[in-house]
């Protein structure tokens, strides 16, 4: 399919250097320019020319077949009992084989006008051969013939066979072609002439006028007027090649048309998504100002909190995580570190922290969901905060995170996860993704009441809500997404608290990033399948299903799956369409993304100088994410089971946050 698309693009170059003719540097030979006529052959270096007999006109039509004007010309010729010679583009013949067959069936003659209309004098040797051979293949596949008549594109009268065109003409005649040009306009029909037309409305009107000329006895084909043999039957191999060419052309054309629609729809959806994110982000800001904690009618939540920290081989960052929690302004905490069978010193480091609020539970390795359920069973408080063991909390994060739970309908709250280790290009790209992608999405999800994920790095829950859905399920690899969807289906609302900031460590190598995102994507698609029934639900569950699941399916599965195809078609546009127009569309879309990303960074209180890396992110990072989605979907379709993939921690997030140039930022409204 890709090869067919490339061939379709080559056949339909909008900008093609081989279709532009250079000025002649030497005149046509005298035997051609001042010869007996416009039909030219070369036999053993001897130039022979011929003209139509008196009162005989050979009507010739270049290009096409055109689906609009060729049928009208054929109808006109049939009505006047006239015949003509059609010099066809091979590419058009392959696209419209029925018209080629009609031309032949109605007694008209077919010649070659090359495959794409390339100027043969400007073509490379390979292009020269392809232009002629592919046209013969198209004719063999449609009407089972090999033509010996050739009209070279961008030539009219014999004297236009000058400079490079004459060299190309000699090569063509060496292949057995007879060259057909046209008589000059000053020659009268009664003298006998070859008249040249295109297959257009103008040609139709001029042909109709010429057919009424009383000085002409016969309108016929070039070969009939001169007694030439224009065809030989095509061989079996040529017919097979021609048939394959026609089918390949049809496939490439269908794929090109489909991709035009896909690219248009995907581009429109992308722009609408960006506009929607900006609109709903602003709506979220206004909502925070009116209806969320800080408003006089919302009580302050001061109840004690249990913090669950599941950990597996997290010795690099567990101490920073626990100490950041102990520095919380919300003092009434129960911090439970659940060591899930670590093979390093995670449990020892956590147990060595001398604070009565910290408890360490050891269990055999059973996975993150099991560790969280173990901690939930030991929780003493009605409010549960779940934290990844590589996350560092701001001092006021816990207190801010639990404030939306003042509303009795709220069952869970997502915090604002920020990238702590931002040194390096890969980390900067993920920082942009967290602000521009994840956090803008969460603002929109809250307004639309369809939050899809409370991240494992920072999230608050009602204990009753967790127990009501059976705790944390291990049915999927994205237990946080699975849990969030289950809460919506149970009738709970889920909100986003932007001011509750926690810093997480992101992968610093492509291998680690791939494994992490593969797990996220695989688990998210699993959760979508598990909770697909929410689409048909009512009330809170139904709103979540129809909005949240539809959004995930469209923008996180379908469009990424189409991304490689869209990229191929974008490359097609650069190579075969107007490159300036294609580049203009791409830069316009990039500008929209930069503006949206800048707005997202401003809302999160972040510096906007990171935007310089965004063009590179689009070319490299997003392609990686698209491939992750493709691999996840293929793995699910094949029934593959993916194990939990743990990322090797370095503790650099905590070091960089507390370093000489900390990334402290406060969301703005």
Regions found by a protein language model. Give the residues of each.
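N-terminal pre-catalytic segment of deacetylase/amide-hydrolase enzymes
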Residues: 1-59, 66-79, 208, 215-246, ...
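N-terminal signal-anchor transmembrane helix
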Residues: 19-20, 39-52, 278-332
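Active-site beta->alpha N-cap acidic-glycine motif
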Residues: 23-141, 145-146
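Catalytic domains of cell-wall/extracellular-matrix polysaccharide-remodeling enzymes
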Residues: 117-226
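Membrane-embedded multi-pass helical conduit in multi-pass membrane proteins
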Residues: 268, 278-299, 551-638
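Cell-envelope/extracellular polymer assembly enzymes that use nucleotide-activated donors
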Residues: 303-306, 334, 467, 482
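A conserved acidic beta->alpha catalytic loop
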Residues: 324, 331, 339-347, 366
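Long helical/loop segments within the catalytic core of UDP-sugar-dependent glycosyltransferases
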Residues: 364-365, 369-377, 381-382, 387, ...
């Amino acid at each position: 399919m890709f090869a067919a698309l490339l061939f379709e693009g080559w056949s339909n170059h909008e900008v093609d250097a081989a279709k532009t003719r250079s000025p002649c540097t030497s005149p046509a030979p005298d035997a051609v320019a001042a010869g007996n006529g416009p039909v030219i052959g070369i036999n053993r270096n001897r130039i022979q020319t011929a003209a139509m007999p008196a009162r005989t006109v050979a009507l010739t039509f270049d290009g096409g077949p055109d689906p609009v004007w060729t049928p009208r010309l054929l109808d006109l010729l049939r009505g006047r009992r006239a015949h003509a010679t059609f010099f066809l583009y091979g590419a058009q013949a392959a696209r419209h084989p029925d018209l080629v067959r009609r031309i032949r069936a109605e007694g008209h003659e077919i010649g070659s006008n090359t495959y794409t209309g390339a100027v043969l004098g400007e073509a490379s040797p390979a292009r020269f051969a392809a232009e002629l051979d592919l046209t013969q293949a198209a004719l063999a596949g449609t009407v089972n013939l090999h033509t010996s008549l050739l009209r070279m594109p961008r030539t009219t009268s014999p004297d236009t066979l000058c400079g490079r065109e004459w060299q190309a003409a000699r090569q063509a005649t060496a292949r057995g072609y007879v060259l057909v040009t046209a008589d000059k306009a000053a020659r009268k029909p009664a003298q006998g002439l070859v008249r040249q037309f295109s297959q257009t409305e103008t040609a139709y009107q001029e042909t109709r006028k010429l057919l009424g000329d009383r000085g002409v006895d016969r309108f016929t084909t070039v070969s009939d007027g001169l007694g030439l043999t224009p065809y030989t039957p095509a061989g079996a191999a040529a017919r097979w090649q021609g048939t394959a060419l026609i089918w390949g052309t049809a496939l490439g054309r269908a794929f090109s048309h489909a991709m035009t629609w896909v690219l248009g729809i995907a581009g429109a959806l992308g722009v609408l998504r960006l506009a929607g994110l900006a609109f709903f982000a602003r709506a979220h800001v206004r909502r925070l100002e009116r209806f969320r904690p800080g408003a006089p009618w919302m009580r302050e939540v001061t109840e004690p909190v249990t913090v669950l920290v599941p950990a597996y081989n997290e010795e690099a960052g567990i101490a920073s995580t626990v100490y950041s929690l102990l520095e919380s302004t919300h003092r009434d905490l129960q911090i439970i570190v659940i060591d899930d069978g670590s093979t390093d010193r995670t449990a020892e480091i956590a147990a060595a922290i001398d604070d009565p609020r910290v408890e360490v539970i050891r269990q055999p390795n059973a996975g993150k969901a099991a560790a969280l359920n173990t901690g939930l069973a030991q929780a003493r408080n009605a409010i549960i905060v779940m934290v990844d063991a590589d996350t560092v909390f701001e001092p006021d994060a816990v207190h801010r995170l639990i404030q939306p739970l003042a509303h009795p309908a709220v069952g869970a709250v997502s915090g604002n996860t920020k990238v702590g280790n931002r040194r390096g290009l890969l980390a900067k790209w993920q920082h942009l993704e967290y602000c521009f992608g994840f956090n803008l999405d969460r603002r929109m999800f809250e307004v639309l009441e369809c939050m899809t994920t409370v991240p494992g790095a920072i999230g608050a829950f009602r204990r009753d809500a967790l127990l009501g859905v059976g705790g944390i399920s291990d049915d999927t690899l994205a237990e946080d997404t699975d849990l969030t969807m289950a809460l919506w289906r149970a009738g709970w609302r889920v909100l986003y608290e932007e001011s509750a900031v926690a810093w997480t460590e992101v992968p610093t190598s492509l291998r680690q990033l791939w494994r992490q995102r593969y797990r996220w994507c695989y688990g998210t698609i699993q959760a979508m399948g598990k909770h697909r029934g929410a689409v048909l639900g009512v009330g809170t569950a139904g709103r979540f299903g129809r909005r949240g699941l539809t959004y995930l399916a469209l923008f996180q599965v379908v469009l990424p799956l189409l991304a490689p195809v869209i990229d191929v078609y974008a490359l097609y546009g650069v190579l075969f369409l107007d490159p300036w127009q294609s580049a203009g569309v791409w830069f316009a879309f990039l500008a929209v993304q930069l503006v949206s990303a800048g707005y997202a960074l401003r809302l999160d209180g972040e510096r906007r100088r990171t935007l310089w890396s965004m063009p590179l992110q689009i070319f490299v990072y997003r392609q990686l994410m698209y491939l992750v989605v493709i691999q996840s979907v293929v793995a699910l379709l094949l029934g593959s089971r993916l194990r939990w993939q743990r990322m090797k921690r370095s503790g650099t997030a905590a070091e960089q946050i507390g370093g000489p140039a900390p990334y402290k930022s406060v969301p703005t409204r």
